[in-house]
Swiss-Prot record:
It comes from Mycoplasma pneumoniae (strain ATCC 29342 / M129 / Subtype 1). Belongs to the UPF0134 family. This is UPF0134 protein MPN_410. Transmembrane segments: none annotated. SUPFAM superfamilies: MPN010-like (SSF144266).
Amino acid sequence: MKEKIPFYNEKEFNEMMKKTKKGTFSGWYIINPENNSVEFSGSFNRQFKLNKPIIPVNTEYVTRKEFNEYKDSNDQRLIKIETTLTAQGEQINKLTQTVEKQGEQIRELQVEQKAQGEQIKAQGETLKLILQTLQKMSDRLDKIDPPK
């Protein structure tokens, strides 16, 4: 199977200029691995355009250095995200602990309120008994000493 590789390296361009004695050109190297041959297909031009080859418009190439820089920056961004996530996880753990403590405090307060409610009920019952005894005493006093 033939492989097409775009041709736009400046060094290769200068070498091709020396060989062909022509100006600028654009095209493709066609590499045939079956017979280890390299062909050039494209258009040759006698006009010089600042001694630079014409780069195909539709293609974009990234150097290894640019790719590694992108990879490193992406890794650094991921590391930052991981550190923020771990920090947020720790904050969430602290918040859950405080919520659990507050829940225990609320339960203790509920128990205290129940105990106070029972005490108030008991005091109310004793007050009712005292009122009943006072009423009975006033009734007895009225029987002994009728009002005139």
